[in-house]
């Protein structure tokens, strides 16, 4: 894929059966937990994108032996803990990776220095560093905890921590640090977030206690990791990533005559908010062949071209679909009426300011968008937008893929300026979409 640009053009119907790449969240965690565990962990279906490979290299730097045995098949020999790295840990663009790794590293009496690419160096890490500091870790770095920074861990105290925002990354960092904290840890969530860390800790042999408790008219989720948990290597089958499956599925919904099935998609209820929302918009979206793999429910999803209508997305749904709002906004651009997306301020501190970039990209393609501090409103006419724009992505893979999907059904082609970053989460995106019949070419 050219770094200079990539463009998509309207064409015929999209048809076919494909598999989504492995889930990025579970792929990161399989590497980290495998390195923390004692013994052998085998992984199948790993997402071999740039972000996960950066996490794999980091685990090697912390002393784990990691080998690739085939496409998506990896073996991790863990030593039951981390060794002090001899060089700086470069996490590339992997925000999930660096935040979880810092949590894991905080449990060991050593120093580790972390950096990343330009985008990651601009993202604040304070939300993770604050609870780690309360547990006894120390750090030295730039303003608001921006990378590069050095973390010194060891001798951690237990912590009862209420998340100030819905963040699975912060929760996971505290839980991973809690593996080596005196007294264990408890994380209290005001809104339930993706629970892959809890599920996978159990799969590796740890005890994790999850309880929902009422406080007034609100329910809080309490996640407790008792002291002294040990991890043992296991087998991980990585399901298809619902965030990646969203792109071919939405493409099928907006390109006339299309029918696309994505097999093996994870259906964890804390990750499927987009599919619920699309069905509320009138999408012909059918889930079949539901089964369980490595503790996660998976299934096949078929999408057929649909006339969509605007909806109000409940703000409390945001944690279950925070990465999918850019592609939801594309679907909304083809719907009739307003689609209101609020309570998504978290989008502004992702790989880019995704609220502004999504709004600006859609506006450039002729879509009516109102940007708000914590969200945006997209008004569609029920007809294809005009397209014909080059969208500025600031190197954000989800912004790039979302607008390329728009171009497949717009009145004129749409180009994106930095498609190279798509490899962070969906390295086979262009080939998969071409295989379904899409027109994609270098810009």
UniProtKB/Swiss-Prot annotation:
The keyword Cell division appears for this protein: no
Binding site for phosphoenolpyruvate: 24, 95, 123, 169, 354, 398
Protein name: 3-phosphoshikimate 1-carboxyvinyltransferase
Residue numbers annotated as active site: 323
Alphabetized SUPFAM superfamilies for the sequence: EPT/RTPC-like
Keyword terms of this UniProt record: Amino-acid biosynthesis, Aromatic amino acid biosynthesis, Cytoplasm, Transferase
Family: Belongs to the EPSP synthase family.
Gene designation per UniProt: aroA
Protein's cellular compartments: Cytoplasm
Pfam families found in the cross-reference section: EPSP_synthase
Assembly behavior: Monomer.
One GO molecular-function entry: 3-phosphoshikimate 1-carboxyvinyltransferase activity
Residues reported to bind 3-phosphoshikimate: 24-25, 29, 167, 169, 323, 350
